[in-house]
Amino acid sequence: MSQLDVLIVDDEESIRNLIAANLKDEGFNPKVAANSTQALKILSEKPVSAVVLDIWLQGSEIDGLGILEIIKKRYPLMPVIIISGHGTIETAVNAIKMGAYDYIEKPFNNDKLVILLTRACEVTKLKRENIDLKSKVIDKTELVGECSVTLKYKMAIAKAATSSCRIMIHGKVGSGKELAARLIHKQSKRVNNPFIIFSPTCMTTEKINQELFGELEKQANNKRPTILEFANNGTLYIDEVSNIPIPIQVKLLKFLKDQTITKPCGKNIKIDIKIITGTSKNIQDEVNNGKFLEDLYYRLNVSSLKVPSLYERKEDIPLLVKYFVKQLSKFSGLKERSFADETIAALQSYEWPGNIRQLRNVVEWTLIMNPLTTGNNEIIKPYMIPSEILANSANLTKLEDSFDMLSMPLREAREVFERQYLSAQMSRFNNNISKTSSFVGMERSALHRKLKLLSLHIPPTNRINDEEYEEANA
């Protein structure tokens, strides 16, 4: 347990130096701070293994409980041992509820503190190992997919992560805007600092104001840190930024100009954060309609990132389904199942208005509603997925219900089948001629001729080169 960094925060110099000397003799590497400013500066430079924190700090802007709250927000696993010379049972209980590892009263036996620190660091080490083990199976910042659209998107995220400018992420509901923000933070220089998510949706104007700036008159003496303070030195992601009311937009614009917030006590605090915003709306339309400040839009949209919809990433659906099945099996106790090729085809033919989130919900619903009847891995067939998916899967599943073809002559029935089959496959591969022809086993020019014969339209952007197209349609 040697050379573990321990931060000692106490306003009395003699006490903090005594604790530091004792801990150094026991093999720890102590650091000392007299107030919240010094303590938070040390933590921002390099997180420590544990903190010994006095509750009553004279001359400190934030008291011990306030520092504890900040630490548990920024560094959830960091153990904090509270010390106090004149505390109460109520204070001790509050500290434990807020996440303190333990509470001891001054004067205390040095051996007791060493035992507590050693135990706290061991427990934290086990927690970290457990989290690392889980992350090997499921990574919350893993972008699953290998199609060309996804690869380009991954490159755009990597490029955005190297920039220090503000980024606005545009994407439909459920497409993964928060994931994009997490990936940008994970690949940036701020990776070891806080990543804070703020969603103003369903909040009142007063609540948004309190969370961001902490300026409620009724709470003028409240020293609770704001969201901006929690995110200091890290990344703040504001989800659905267009839901912020105009009065708060004005304050946010002022903050972006000078990167400073004014506390109720009148003190100005400099904040260093990377701001990423997300929106499913057309912000330019919101500006034109007077619902969003134009200047704020330009300051937040310095760099723009578009999240592709699942409809644009249909080729990733097989990988996504496997990923969600494994995730649900690991953390929800559902049995792993394989999805039949025809089931995957049905999923690929659906338009997915709810994007990735909807696909995950469909996979979970399917596993729950179709429990294993044997100990074997029963294949998920098309009839097992939600009926609305089948009903809207671009006629793919209608092939199974075409009993009326039995009353047709062979040539007519074959034409009906080919039209339905090729229409479904074209939809499945986003009207991509090369991929569709490869899957169905036809030359591209032959597929073009067949589609023209069946009166199936091909978008110009998905045609082969003009020479080959003209030859196929000659």
UniProtKB/Swiss-Prot annotation:
Family annotation (InterPro entries): AAA+_ATPase, CheY-like_superfamily, Homeodomain-like_sf, HTH_Fis, P-loop_NTPase, Sig_transdc_resp-reg_receiver, Sigma_54_int, Sigma_54_int_dom_CS
Free-text function comment from the UniProt entry: Member of the two-component regulatory system RC0849/RC0948.
Domain Sigma-54 factor interaction: residue ranges: 143-368
Binding residues for ATP: 171-178, 231-240
Residue list for modification 4-aspartylphosphate: D54
Residue ranges of domain Response regulatory in the record: 5-121
Alphabetically ordered keywords of this record: ATP-binding, Nucleotide-binding, Phosphoprotein, Transcription, Transcription regulation, Two-component regulatory system
Protein name as it appears in the record: Putative response regulator NtrX-like
Presence of the UniProt keyword Lyase in the record: no
One BP term from GO: regulation of DNA-templated transcription
Organism of provenance: Rickettsia conorii (strain ATCC VR-613 / Malish 7)
Molecular functions (GO terms): ATP binding; ATP hydrolysis activity; sequence-specific DNA binding
TM stretches of this protein: none
Family matches, as PANTHER family: TRANSCRIPTIONAL REGULATOR (NTRC FAMILY), TRANSCRIPTIONAL REGULATORY PROTEIN
